């Protein structure tokens, strides 16, 4: 059997790239898929026969009766359920500064979920041309707080401003483009790979948000690596979090825990002598960052009541 990387799934056909010959083939899944040591994100009652092959999977395949059949999947180092992508090296998290308007709440929620998944994040802020210079400067000052945790880029995809500075991060990596619908992920991908077959749409004036332009996850080769364009994220679920351990997914909080009177058991809420709250008062923690933490804590706590 030969080994290949899954690039795309469309209408029952898997597009795979042979890792030795580099040839792209059309393949189908065998009736009963072999999935040794695969940790699935599907429901517990899922079986090998209905196991979902994800974009990014490394698979074994063979030719049978003039049809290439995927026989088995190699163990994944990580995976996402929505979108269905496996073996991710990093996430390129794209936010627009306007249209749709930027929200610190949404940024913090994305970072929280990706931190739980133990995925490296690169932050990209698009549509810088649509802000007045003074407003852009103000936004950059506020966003600079996040630079101590993630690589950081400002871009204008349509005019290709900042695109060249971004290219090196894709080398030898499988990179997932993530972000709210309409922030310019497909436009960014088109700026990086002009011949990629993509459709971009204008923002809905009535809703102030984007329409879906990507329906299925797909791997595109670029600069020695692969970029995964995914459907827009319309729902960010916090149901996998526990209120008491939420704080552990805030690296900027963790570095101040040593100053908490209650140490690692401190929730950074009502406790006295809290190192995180002291750092907040001293301007070392962004106020919106802490406020969003409290909001997420209450949201998760309320979910447990039902």
Curated annotation (Swiss-Prot):
Coiled coil: none
This enzyme's EC code(s): 3.6.1.-
Any one Pfam family match given in the protein's UniProt record, by short name: RsgA_GTPase
MF (Gene Ontology): GTP binding; GTPase activity; metal ion binding; rRNA binding
Any one Gene Ontology cellular component term annotated for this protein: cytoplasm
Alphabetical list of PROSITE patterns matching this protein: ENGC_GTPASE (PS50936), G_CP (PS51721)
Domain CP-type G: 77-236
InterPro entries linked to this entry: G_CP_dom (IPR030378), P-loop_NTPase (IPR027417), Ribosome_biogen_GTPase_RsgA (IPR004881), RsgA_GTPase_dom (IPR010914)
Gene Ontology annotations of biological process type: ribosomal small subunit biogenesis
Subcellular location: Cytoplasm
Keyword Zinc: yes
Note on how the cofactor is bound: Binds 1 zinc ion per subunit.
Keywords from the named record: Cytoplasm, GTP-binding, Hydrolase, Metal-binding, Nucleotide-binding, Ribosome biogenesis, RNA-binding, rRNA-binding, Zinc
Function (record text): One of several proteins that assist in the late maturation steps of the functional core of the 30S ribosomal subunit. Helps release RbfA from mature subunits. May play a role in the assembly of ribosomal proteins into the subunit. Circularly permuted GTPase that catalyzes slow GTP hydrolysis, GTPase activity is stimulated by the 30S ribosomal subunit.
Oligomeric and partner information: Monomer. Associates with 30S ribosomal subunit, binds 16S rRNA.
Family label: Belongs to the TRAFAC class YlqF/YawG GTPase family. RsgA subfamily.
Protein name listed in UniProt: Small ribosomal subunit biogenesis GTPase RsgA
Organism: Onion yellows phytoplasma (strain OY-M)
